[in-house]
Swiss-Prot record:
Name the UniProt record assigns to this protein: Energy-coupling factor transporter transmembrane protein EcfT 1
Similarity-based family: Belongs to the energy-coupling factor EcfT family.
Entry function: Transmembrane (T) component of an energy-coupling factor (ECF) ABC-transporter complex. Unlike classic ABC transporters this ECF transporter provides the energy necessary to transport a number of different substrates.
GO CC term (a single one): plasma membrane
UniProt main location, coarse: membrane
Length: 266
């Protein structure tokens, strides 16, 4: 499961989505998550699913890659869905026992929560798969630039976010190596009760933390060796530019919002 984590990786390509400005993709991603909460019925969610599938198709990356990105988080999603089903009340009651209630409203809300999680993960994965870490850092710094007036270290925050995203697949790969080494020594991560399984997982974290600190120190040394002193006065080799495609993307998001409002109120 660990090696299937896609979030944080970049896949080179020449698709329309790859060609969009990183700021456009980042702002559109936040906007997409915001308007997703406007969806409140089957028609609105059908529109969002159709739009998301179209975006995935435009990336030139196979859909199964994005599905792999959802799989590592499926248990968290299902747990949230079950909580919605058991504790949301309203509509026709199918089962009622103590604090637990299964109703038509709870089932419907559970399906919508599942779709919402999956769509957010897929759209977030679209951004990271089609945007280089450097462009993503510059986009975050640009968006946070107004906070620089308040003496907020915008460039440092952008760098930390970018490094964190970049290190997700690296740390997951490191975890996978440690788990394989433990299995080679006879450790079985699937046996025993919950307490025993948690006890088996503990030895993974110590070498993982050591490896993480070592990688962080190596990265800091490499940045210092290249003369990095923060974002102040730093020049950039690649300058982000708005293009006509970014204007088209903004218009598409406006049309998507209008469609959601119409389907929501109809």
């Amino acid at each position: 499961m660990i090696e299937k984590l896609i979030l944080g990786r970049f896949v080179p390509g020449e698709s329309l989505i790859h060609g969009l400005d990183a700021r456009t993709k980042l702002l559109a991603g936040f906007y997409y998550i915001g308007i997703l909460f406007l969806a409140n019925n089957w028609w609105t969610y059908a529109l969002m699913v159709l739009f998301t599938l179209m975006v995935v198709q435009m990336t030139g990356i196979k859909l199964k890659v994005f599905i792999k990105g959802v799989k590592p988080l499926i248990w968290l999603i299902l747990f949230t869905v079950v909580m919605q089903i058991l504790f949301a009340s309203g509509g026709t009651i199918y089962f009622d026992w103590g604090p637990f209630t299964i109703s038509s409203f709870g089932l419907l809300n559970g399906v919508f929560v599942f779709l919402r999680f999956v769509l957010i993960i897929i759209m977030s994965t679209v951004i990271t798969l089609t945007t280089t870490p450097m462009n993503l850092t510059d986009a975050i710094a640009y968006i946070l630039r107004p906070f620089a007036v308040l003496k907020v270290p915008v460039n440092d925050i952008a760098l930390m976010i970018s490094v964190a995203l970049r290190f997700i697949p690296t740390l997951m790969g490191e975890t996978d190596k440690i788990m394989k080494a433990q299995r080679a020594r006879g450790v079985d991560f699937g046996e025993g009760n919950l307490f025993e399984q948690m006890k088996v997982v503990v030895p993974i974290f110590i070498p993982l933390f050591v490896s993480s600190f070592n990688r962080a120190e190596e990265l800091a040394d490499a940045m210092e060796a290249r003369g990095y002193q923060g974002g102040e006065g730093r020049t950039r080799f690649r300058i982000l530019h708005w293009h006509f495609g970014d204007l088209i993307a903004a218009c598409v998001m406006i049309l998507l919002t209008a469609g959601l409002v119409i389907l929501r109120t109809s």
